């Protein structure tokens, strides 16, 4: 069955790389239960491999989780394409493959062009945009499990995410009991956790973010409240539990963990830099992890839109992984 999922999408030529677009990682997948994969072209063949050919390269993988406040339909796996192509163009950074994961989104009734549910009640509801926690993180873990257990790749990898994708990066290495809370009967896919992560412009303490934003971001308080409640419901205890700042002892929580390469622009107009300060301080108090801060500039989405700094950050993370 896995081979059918994998083979349902062709390899396409993308310059120096091969690309599979929107590979489904579950049966009966929506368009958001998919991932994109890029891998370097093999030295030997000039023709495109058939759709059933699995990635063969040696070296670590990069798995990326897009942002968008768990709800933005215009930010998806393709947002990492410029970064993936640039990363794979460097011969001095051996990367076996890059995966960028889609996951179901929460509703966004006020989106200016793509509201969900639709404003016109006669239009069909998009079931891929009705997710509630823990749907997002369960989908991500399912995607990583598909890569590792079904395709047999990405056992050694850097996990990176932007904005809410940075939150999900930490959730991946947390004990699921933290973010599952009182949810019953939910099967959590088991994955091999990364040793190095690279969270970018992240949301790490939603309650602090909502209840006490810095003066520079106070005007966004209602926006923060809206997207948090959309994804996680009204219970503030849940907002706290899903966040990495709720972990009392990161050493026991993530024993595999070695390095966190963290970055945020101080000019981020959407997420206050105080979130990164909180997370850095929390990790230093509760773990023996090496916490490395990398330079980032511009506004919230400039990191992935411009690709230069994010490439440097991920290359740095891969460098740390290579030394372990």
Regions found by a protein language model. Give the residues of each.
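Mobile cap/lid helix-loop segments that gate and shape the active-site cleft of serine hydrolases
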Residues: 9-12, 27, 203, 208-251
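C-terminal catalytic histidine-bearing segment of alpha/beta-hydrolase fold enzymes
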Residues: 263, 267-324
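Short beta-to-alpha linker loops that shape the active-site pocket of alpha/beta-hydrolase fold enzymes
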Residues: 68, 99-109, 203, 298-299
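Conserved alpha/beta-hydrolase
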Residues: 87-112, 117-120
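Primarily recognizes the serine-hydrolase "nucleophile elbow" in alpha/beta-hydrolase
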Residues: 142-213
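Alpha/beta-hydrolase active-site loop
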Residues: 114-151
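Short, surface-exposed "cap/lid" segments of acyl-processing enzymes
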Residues: 41-93
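N-terminal cap/lid segment of alpha/beta-hydrolase-fold proteins
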Residues: 2-57
